[in-house]
């Protein structure tokens, strides 16, 4: 039996929504916005109330202009200074605290990337609140869902903190539309440089393949490949479909590939349209990082491998025969 909410309850709920306001911390590289920020904006809009976005950097005018066009954002706050080079958390934290104090935001969030995981615990500590990490759903302005036990269980968290600080798993929310918005832009609160650390340099690996967390197709290899040289089989296959290449923790620990390729609970979380797992047994830590993929194809010679339990399509065969055959077929198409 359902009971209609009393008019007083509805008025109180509407009043609470009017007072909700969320600050999204933008992750970017000065000239381009990190895709996970768009997913975070979508999560923020589900809280109700006004959504603002804070952009800090050295030359971030283009990113700020792009954010003004994103659907769901009411205001873009821009802070430009040399100390924000590299988006160091030591410098960003005072800026975020000053912005929160000025506008009295009820929620502060960022993507659950290395950037967000490095920044938000510091912000929460300064606000003297407990942060919530890696949320996958929002039930209400004070109730969030996150995974525990390597993704095998869901935990619903009710947060009574005065300011809710949380990071968002990008694969759990659609990206916000990059057009249709008309947000205003203004300068953020000025803060004095902390200067307890200095950004020196960053060298990015250049590749014709897409970035792992944003790719539509991912080909990942495990210990079954037996060596780093054999990962060339996956590179050849991936190049036929403009796919990214990942790896299991076992392959990374064995020294086959660098750890920036690791997919899993302690690596990167991916949810591509197609995920091809080659020579991966399917430890729960790996499954936690890829089980939200739309279609999963597993190739393993062991028919009892756990990876087949989550796969949509399974091939029980020797990967050293199957993968080259797949590559040749795709080359002809």
UniProtKB/Swiss-Prot annotation:
Residues 205-333 are annotated as: Domain II. Gene3D superfamilies: HUPs, TPP-binding domain. This is Electron transfer flavoprotein subunit alpha, mitochondrial. Binds 1 FAD per dimer. Residues 20-204 are annotated as: Domain I. GO terms for cellular component: mitochondrial matrix. FAD binds at residues 223, 248, 263-266, 281-286, 300, 318-319. GO terms for biological process: fatty acid beta-oxidation using acyl-CoA dehydrogenase. SMART domains: ETF. It comes from Pongo abelii.
């Amino acid at each position: 039996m359902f009971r209609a909410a009393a008019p007083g309850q509805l008025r109180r709920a509407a009043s609470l929504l009017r007072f909700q306001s969320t600050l999204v911390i933008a992750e970017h590289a000065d000239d381009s916005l990190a895709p996970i920020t768009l997913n975070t904006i979508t999560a923020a809009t589900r809280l109700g109330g006004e959504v603002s976005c804070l952009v800090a950097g050295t030359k971030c005018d283009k990113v700020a202009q792009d954010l003004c066009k994103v659907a769901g954002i009411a205001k873009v706050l821009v802070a430009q200074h040399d100390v924000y080079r590299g988006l160091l958390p030591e410098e960003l934290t005072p800026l975020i605290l000053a912005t929160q104090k000025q506008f009295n935001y009820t929620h502060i969030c960022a993507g659950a990337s290395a950037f967000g995981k490095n920044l938000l615990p510091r912000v929460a500590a300064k606000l003297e609140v407990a942060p919530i990490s890696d949320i996958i759903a929002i039930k209400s302005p004070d109730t969030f869902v996150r995974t525990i036990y390597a993704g095998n269980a869901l935990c619903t968290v009710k947060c009574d903190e005065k300011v809710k600080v949380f990071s968002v798993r990008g694969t759990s929310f659609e990206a916000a539309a990059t057009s249709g918005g008309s947000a205003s832009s203004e300068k953020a609160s000025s803060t004095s440089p902390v200067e307890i650390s200095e950004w020196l340099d960053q060298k990015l690996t250049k590749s014709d393949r897409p970035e792992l967390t944003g790719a539509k197709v991912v080909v990942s290899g495990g210990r079954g490949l037996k060596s780093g040289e054999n990962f060339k089989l996956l590179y050849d296959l991936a190049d036929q479909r403009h796919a990214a290449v990942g790896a299991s923790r076992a392959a990374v620990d064995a020294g086959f590939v660098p750890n920036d390729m690791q997919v899993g609970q302690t690596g990167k979380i991916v949810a591509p349209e197609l995920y091809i797992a080659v020579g991966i047994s399917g430890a729960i830590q790996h499954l936690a990082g890829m089980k939200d993929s739309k279609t999963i194809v597993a190739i393993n010679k062991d028919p009892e491998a756990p990876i087949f339990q989550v796969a949509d399509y399974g091939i029980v065969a020797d990967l050293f025969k199957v993968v080259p055959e797949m590559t040749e077929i795709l080359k002809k198409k």
